[in-house]
């Protein structure tokens, strides 16, 4: 558990539990509403969150017991991968996302990872500058084939050494 004061709040980061699956799915879907211009439907559901938890896990950020952020984390050998970074729309622009990335990187360092990988949808033009400012660099692209897409998209792969 890690605490950090941000915008006069105390943020607590913890490993998610299976009982958090519904709240995580709801938060991710809220945060990913900004992608409705290119994808139809919800980003995830509680069943998928539970499946991801069984494979790896999520970190949760809370303020006074309220779930305000989460991120999927997975150790892949000497590399870490994170995705579904989500912050409650009412709590964005307060540094919670940046803090959650910092805590995610600390999680991977503790697991012995030498680098972190992410992938972002190229249509989200706000994301590359955010991650570049945190030290991530583009390493390639990957197809994004999904029936829920309403327009063509691909992933931009980014990496950061730890």
Where are these regions (language model features)?
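Conserved glycine-rich acetyl-CoA-binding loop
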Residues: 66, 88-102, 111, 122-129, ...
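Glycine-centered loop/turn positions within well-structured domains
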Residues: 80, 94, 156
């Amino acid at each position: 558990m890690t605490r950090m004061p941000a915008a006069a709040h105390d943020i607590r980061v913890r490993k998610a539990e299976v009982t958090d699956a519904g709240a995580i799915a709801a938060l991710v879907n809220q945060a990913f509403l900004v992608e409705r211009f290119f994808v139809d439907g919800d980003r995830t559901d509680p069943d998928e969150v539970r499946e991801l938890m069984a494979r790896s896990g999520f970190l949760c950020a809370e303020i006074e017991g309220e779930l305000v952020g989460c991120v999927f984390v997975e150790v892949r050998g000497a590399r870490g991968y994170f995705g579904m970074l989500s912050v409650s729309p009412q709590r964005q622009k307060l540094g919670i996302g940046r803090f959650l990335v910092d805590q995610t990187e600390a999680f991977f360092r503790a697991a012995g990872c030498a680098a972190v990988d992410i992938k972002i949808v190229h249509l989200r033009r706000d994301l590359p500058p955010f991650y570049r400012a945190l030290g991530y660099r583009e390493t390639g692209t990957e197809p994004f084939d999904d029936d829920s897409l309403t327009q063509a998209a691909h992933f931009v792969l980014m990496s950061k050494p730890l």
